Design a protein with these regions (language model features):
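Short hydrophobic alpha-helix segments
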Residues: 127, 214, 237-239
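N-terminal "domain-start" segment that seeds a small globular fold
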Residues: 96-134
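Internal/C-terminal transmembrane anchor helices
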Residues: 65-93
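Structural micro-motif
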Residues: 197-201, 216-227
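Membrane-embedded alpha-helical segments of integral membrane proteins
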Residues: 6-58
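Short active-site neighborhood of thiol/selenol oxidoreductases, capturing the structured segment around
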Residues: 126-164
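Thiol-/selenol-based redox modules, centered on thioredoxin-like
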Residues: 20, 222-261
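Structural microenvironment flanking redox-active thiols in thiol-disulfide oxidoreductases
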Residues: 158-196, 206-212
């Protein structure tokens, strides 16, 4: 067996590992279910591991000593391991170490009132959002879904936004208005809504004043969090996470909305 016959599966495994690493944000943009647990990327890493292992097995067949002639293949094998280790560390450890929220409004508590500019720069208060006169489907208004998010360029955030937009008609039909709060300026939120086709409300909190009052701040941005408020401003459901990737799915939000009376 030639050296090339040993090296090609190892290098193929390396490139597949690279694809598995860099494709994660694109994967969960296309398939949001992979955002919470990257099963598709882990499958690619598994296939890459099989290719690398097959190449190494061929190199170390008894009596062949082909390992002396596959220096580049060994280098690729080591790089593949490093890539997987970095992926696992980033997705399963670092991304899941956001500080726990201890003072966020609890279920049954009244949410803190606030006033923030929307994507058009107009001031909007929580009281106004809860008012039937400003809530779509006013005759059946049941509340507001506050979605705290990071920033416009965040792929995980946009994955959540797309889910909300996809189910927006259902939210509105049940009398609940989704509202995103982030550190983006009104101009940035307006550009995002225009380019992505989002038709729900964005509120801007670049100073993190409201984000910190709700205890969902992480450094200089908001961590993922959702609060479902009834028309009295009382929290009826919330979702807090210590991961920058894991968020409530729209189906979970809709299930919570259905519990509102």
């Amino acid at each position: 067996m030639s050296t090339r016959g040993v090296n090609w599966p190892i290098w193929s495994g390396f490139f597949l590992s690279l694809v598995a690493f860099v494709s994660y944000p694109f994967m969960f943009e296309r398939w949001p279910v992979t955002r919470d647990f990257p099963w598709a990327n882990l499958l690619l890493f598994g296939l890459a591991a099989l290719l690398v292992a097959n190449g190494l097995r061929r190199a170390f067949l008894p009596g062949r000593l082909r390992w002396l002639r596959i220096t580049s293949g060994l280098f690729a094998a080591v790089l593949s391991v490093v890539i997987f280790a970095n992926f696992a560390l980033s997705v399963f450890v670092r991304a899941r170490q956001l500080p726990a929220s201890t003072h966020a409004p609890r279920v049954g508590e009244r949410a803190l009132d606030f006033t923030l500019p929307d994507e058009k720069g107009a001031p909007v208060s929580l009281a106004a959002l809860l008012s039937p006169s400003t809530t779509p489907g006013a005759q059946a208004s049941k509340g507001v879904l506050l979605v705290f998010s990071m920033y416009a360029g965040c792929r995980a955030c946009n994955s959540e936004y797309r889910g909300i937009q996809r189910h927006l008609a259902e939210f509105l039909a049940m009398g609940v208005r989704p509202v995103v709060i982030s550190i983006d300026t009104p101009e940035a939120s307006r550009a995002l809504s225009r380019d992505a086709g989002y038709t729900f409300t964005f509120l801007s909190d670049p100073s993190l004043a409201v984000i910190r009052r709700y205890d969902v701040a992480d450094a200089e941005m908001a961590r993922p969090a959702e609060f479902l408020l009834d028309t009295s401003g009382v929290v009826r459901w919330r979702n807090l996470t210590t991961s920058m990737f894991v968020r409530a799915r729209p189906e979970q939000m809709l299930d919570a909305v259905r519990t509102l009376r």
